[in-house]
Curated annotation (Swiss-Prot):
Xref: InterPro entries: Palmitoyltrfase_DHHC, PFA4/ZDH16/20/ERF2-like
Catalytic reactions on record: L-cysteinyl-[protein] + hexadecanoyl-CoA = S-hexadecanoyl-L-cysteinyl-[protein] + CoA
Family annotation (PANTHER family): PALMITOYLTRANSFERASE, ZINC FINGER DHHC DOMAIN CONTAINING PROTEIN
Cellular component per GO, a single term: fungal-type vacuole membrane
Transmembrane parts of this sequence: 22-42, 57-77, 161-181, 192-212
Keywords tagged on the record: Acyltransferase, Lipoprotein, Membrane, Palmitate, Transferase, Transmembrane, Transmembrane helix
Family: Belongs to the DHHC palmitoyltransferase family. PFA5 subfamily.
This protein's name: Palmitoyltransferase PFA5
């Protein structure tokens, strides 16, 4: 039985990894063609060049500048994710679970979490990826469109890609729609313009939904994996406060608790960094080591109260 499950898992992993090569190649080809059509045919031919006595030099140049900024940052963020190294687990020391760590995620029996497949210790917010078949720090999800596990090492770049990609798609969709309404009758539209219009509309819809979802996750300091059934999810924690206790106590959270929610501002900075230029530029990854995460003070107080009541 286990052999069949392992074989299915290997097939699933192989399929996802194949899609993780096909999708990025298709995305780069499609967006590259869209960039050429938008710049050469829409911005230059239909705005900057004189055509039927009409010329909008300023508008064409402004479109090109803003498009290069947003699309350039989108491409750069995408490549940062594409060529990032996943933050694999495996070197977590057992001292992570010592008495100097007052609270950490544990198994239902109170013991430190260990992956049954990788045979490695799992620090807080780490999970096993079914595609990479490795345990990853702050695992979010595997994204076939970038062919990578979105995790601690690239979560910031992934969010920036969604934001800049959505901004560029909006600019292309709106400006193309305006130019079509001014220049062409719908029956005489070039096929290239139709492709750009449809592709940018898909980008706005898809990236917009993803951006809204991940903005909500970011502001609550949860990820896609933790967001599954989060209103009913119960965590198990090993709790120890040396000033009040002699040994660790197993404490369970209440359904819907958000252990790492420290408010919108701190949650944002925990992923995007402390400085405004890090929010804009996809240069530095999220602060921290991917193992230690600050808990909500109110949540720690709740866990302490529960632990003391159980220990008394």
């Amino acid at each position: 039985m286990s052999t069949n499950l392992e074989e299915k898992q290997r097939r699933f992993s192989k399929l996802q990894k194949t899609l993780g090569v096909v999708f990025p190649a298709a995305i780069l080809l499609s967006t590259g063609y869209t960039v050429w059509v938008f710049i050469a045919l829409i911005c230059v031919d239909s705005n900057i060049k004189i055509r039927n006595g009409y010329r909008n030099l300023g508008g064409g140049i402004v479109l090109i500048i803003f498009f290069f900024i947003t699309s350039g940052l989108a491409y750069f963020s995408y490549f940062r994710v594409l060529f990032s190294s996943p933050s694999f687990c495996g070197n977590t020391l057992y001292t992570y679970y010592g008495f100097d760590n007052p609270i950490f995620l544990c198994g239902p029996n109170g013991a430190p979490r260990m992956c049954g497949t990788c045979k490695c210790w799992l620090p807080d917010r780490s999970h096993h990826s079914r595609v990479s078949m490795r345990c990853i720090r702050k695992f979010d999800h595997y994204c076939s469109f970038v062919g990578k596990d979105v995790c601690f090492s690239n979560q910031k770049f992934f969010y920036q890609f969604l934001f800049y990609g959505f901004s560029a798609a909006c600019m292309v969709l709106i400006s193309t729609a305006i130019m079509i309404s001014r220049t062409y009758h719908y029956r005489s539209l070039p096929g290239t313009w139709i492709f750009v219009l449809v592709f940018s509309a898909f980008g706005v819809l898809f990236l917009g939904v993803m951006l809204v979802r991940h903005t909500g996750y970011l502001l609550l300091n949860i990820n896609s994996h933790e967001a599954k059934n989060w209103k009913t999810r119960i965590y198990s924690f090993s709790v120890f406060f040396p000033e009040h206790m002699d040994s660790r106590v197993l404490v369970q959270s209440d359904p819907g608790d958000l252990p790492w929610d420290r408010g919108y501002s701190e949650n944002w900075r925990a992923v995007m960094g402390d400085h405004w230029y890090n929010w804009i530029l996809p240069l530095r990854r999220s602060p921290g080591d991917g193992e230690h995460f600050l808990y909500s003070p109110s949540f720690v107080s709740k866990m302490q109260s529960k632990a003391l009541s159980m220990n008394s």
